[in-house]
Regions:
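A short SAM/SAH-binding and catalytic strip from SAM-dependent methyltransferases
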Residues: 202-214
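Conserved SAM-binding loop of SAM-dependent methyltransferases across substrates and taxa
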Residues: 135-146
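Conserved SAM-binding motif I beta-strand of class I
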Residues: 150-156
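Conserved class I S-adenosyl-L-methionine
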Residues: 124-134
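Short alpha-helix immediately C-terminal to the canonical SAM-binding loop
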Residues: 160-161
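Nucleotide donor/acceptor-binding cores
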Residues: 125-126, 200-202
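S-adenosyl-L-methionine
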Residues: 166-198
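Conserved Class I S-adenosyl-L-methionine-dependent methyltransferase catalytic core
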Residues: 9, 13-120
Length: 215
């Protein structure tokens, strides 16, 4: 933890200001920097601002989504994927302490994605590009599902730092600021465009993020 935290604190000085940002994104970036510089990464998921933006926890509708997962034919897979860990000190779901509302929600989204087309095979998805990757939960779930998958997140530099911490602490191997690895975190729009053109086939994930893009 301390080694990763030290690396992130160093990288937090490299503020990325090229791409335009909405005021909400600016506030989020400032809050993340506060968390990093005050050595609170170990419990960043208890930060109220981070929860408001990234984390769904004790909401009743999550219970119904969990029930739907349990009734699904793929429940043996979902059961493994919803297991929560202690990275970031997440709030556990009050009706299932082995998971969190946010992780249940992310897995539920994957299930609905599968339901949208019978031709989709999760095991055959090799490349994913996610726009706005939260704190890295969806990426972690897909890596857990398939450790050979190529996963690239485009987000703000400061959010990339949060993602790097979360994924690194989950024993993933994220690359910060480049696309040389299997799990890449980038914040340069030009870099994203070049990378996307190289990948002929990929799964594109954007959970609300496209609507937040500055025009």
């Amino acid at each position: 933890h301390q080694r990763i935290e030290k690396f992130i604190k160093k990288k937090s000085n490299e503020i990325y200001k090229i791409n335009p940002r909405l005021s909400t994104h600016k506030n989020l970036a400032e809050e993340i920097l506060k968390i990093i510089k005050s050595d609170n990464l170990i419990k960043f998921l208890r930060n109220s601002f981070i929860q408001k933006i990234f984390f769904i926890h004790n909401r009743l509708f999550i219970y119904y989504e969990l029930l739907e997962l349990k009734k699904d034919i793929n429940w043996p897979i979902w059961k493994k994927l919803i297991l929560e860990n202690d990275v970031g000190t997440p709030v556990r779901f009050f009706l299932n302490s082995s998971s969190s509302g946010n992780r249940i929600r992310q897995v539920y989204i994957i299930k609905k994605f599968l339901n949208s087309s019978k031709s989709i095979n999760l095991n055959k998805i090799q490349n994913i590009i996610e726009i706005g990757g939260g704190y890295g939960c969806m990426a972690d779930i897909f890596c857990k599902l398939n450790n050979k998958i190529s996963y690239t997140i485009y987000d703000m530099h400061e959010v990339n730092l949060l993602q790097f911490y979360f994924l690194k602490m989950n024993n993933r191997k994220p690359k910060l600021g480049n696309v040389s690895g299997k799990l890449n975190l980038i914040s340069d729009l030009n870099q994203l465009n070049k990378f996307a053109k190289r990948k002929k086939n990929y799964c594109f994930i954007a959970n609300w993020s496209i609507s937040e893009f500055p025009i």
